């Protein structure tokens, strides 16, 4: 069973689950409003898949995706990300809720930032091991087919830092 400290870092990384989404118009050009709507809907879809225990949510990551979380090495590449979440989901039940504060489209890159809450429970005992609120930034890269994939993601705690005494 993973140590709670490691679980904290892995839980923080969980915010990255955005599925690929396409928003090309009939003329083949991109529409920033449609891209933003697709990214927001994608996050809602990923939330549902995670809460149902569907490991397929990881298909949202680009092959060269990187998860950057505090106090843990970067998780680099699709295979490493899939391995990470497969291991977690074998023993943990997760309940996540995303809140998007902003989506900005800039050509073939876009970013989304917001917060998420995550509760992780041991599947065998149902004991809650993590119950956190975090902030996140996702950077998406438009794929050749027009879909968006999570390319980079960074998370940190939404709790105020402890004040020195």
Predicted segment positions?
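Hydrophobic/aromatic beta-strand elements that line small-molecule binding cavities or substrate pockets
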Residues: 81, 85, 98-103, 116-118, ...
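Bacterial Sec signal peptide processing site at the extreme N-terminus
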Residues: 22-35
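A solvent-exposed, acidic/Ser-Thr-rich amphipathic alpha-helical stretch
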Residues: 33, 37-38, 42, 54-106, ...
């Amino acid at each position: 069973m993973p140590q709670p400290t490691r679980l904290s870092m892995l839980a923080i990384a969980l915010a990255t689950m955005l599925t690929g989404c396409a928003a090309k118009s009939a003329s083949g050009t991109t529409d920033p409003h449609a891209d933003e709507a697709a990214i927001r809907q994608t996050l809602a879809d990923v939330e549902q898949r995670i809460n149902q225990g569907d490991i397929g949510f990881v298909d949202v990551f680009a092959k060269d995706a990187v998860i950057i979380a505090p106090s843990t090495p970067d998780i680099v590449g699709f295979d490493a990300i899939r391995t990470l979440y497969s291991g977690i989901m074998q023993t943990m039940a997760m309940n996540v809720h995303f809140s998007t504060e902003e989506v900005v489209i800039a050509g073939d890159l876009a970013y989304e930032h917001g917060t998420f809450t995550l509760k992780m429970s041991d599947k065998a005992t149902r004991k809650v091991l993590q119950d956190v609120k975090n902030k996140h930034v996702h950077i998406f890269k438009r794929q050749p087919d027009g879909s968006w994939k999570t390319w980079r993601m960074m998370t940190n705690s939404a709790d105020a830092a402890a004040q020195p005494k």
